Amino acid sequence: MSTSTLAPAADSPRLDWPFLIAAVLGTAVLVALVALDGQPASAALVILGFALGVAFLRAEFSFAAAWRRFLVSGEGGGLIGALLLIAVAALVIVPVAALVPGFGGAIAPIGPSVVIGAFVFGIGMQLANGCGSGTLYTAGGGSGRMLITLALFIAGSVIGSLHLPAFLALGGVDPILASNYLGPWGGLAAALASIAVAAFAIMAIARARGATFKPRRLIVIGAIVIGLLSIGVFLVGHHPWSVTFGLTVWGAKIATLAGFDFSGAAFWQWPGPKRALSESILSDTSSLTDLGMILGAMAAAAAAKPFARTAWPPAKSLLAAAIGGLLMGWGARIGFGCNIGAFVGGVASGSLHGWIWFAAALGGCVVGIRLRPLFGLSRD
């Protein structure tokens, strides 16, 4: 997260009361609206999203930075932290999704769609300096640059929704879910084993490059807390935590208000998207956690230090934020999600597509890192 957006003067008060009060009141109002809408259980998703925003910001948990440090210098602590998060979530998601009716994992077919989408997402992630969840919590935490990324992310995801059916038509392999072959507990063992193998590979690469692979204490705590909160989202929403679908719905609703007709778009005639577009966002679980996350990050930032009015970043940096957001939004929709929905949700569900997404996105990050200097951004 950019510290320039939150840098206080030496004699500034510790709290930014207006923003803190606005975030807390906004959350309370949102919870009340969801409850009054006849969905009291879903109100918990707002609270869980709020807690996720606080946890991400306080732990400075960043997928984009962790991947960049690993690729540039071999430092693996951030990636190990991400794997710990996934392992915690998998302990509940894999067996419950397999054993309890009404629950499901994050699964997707393996084909050109997931590979291309993840690769493009990886490029955008490095230009934007954040992923889907990172965009939400840094925007909520006061980063004007990330507000630009968020707006273009939303636009890109709507464009991606129009292209997704054509990419799926290219073919691929049906979803491969470990629990379908090994049962709930065998599937869990396979998921945890795959995470362990990835962790050992990261540690080996870090050692070979003379870098550290031990995550900071704050990252370890953050990973465990975020993993537990992800379990909470799963238990309440009956599906692993997702970030980008909510953003796609927001964009489509805005486009509809502007006069755009989605009746001829195949994606928006599928049952889930069609229902989300026609109903209130208060009925969409992804939207509720997204809104809660923004408000939670705002509250956490305001409770730590005042929001400072600072000059906008250079034009090149803003252009990178816009391009990165557009690429991430498009890639997330084509590739079945972002770091949260595709990587964390997929691997924690025991779905092979999660690892395919990770590998393709890592390749995209290599390209994105090489492009960063063109926009005045450091490769580190």
Segments predicted by a language model, with ranges:
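Membrane-interfacial helix-loop segments of redox and metal-homeostasis proteins
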Residues: 2-380
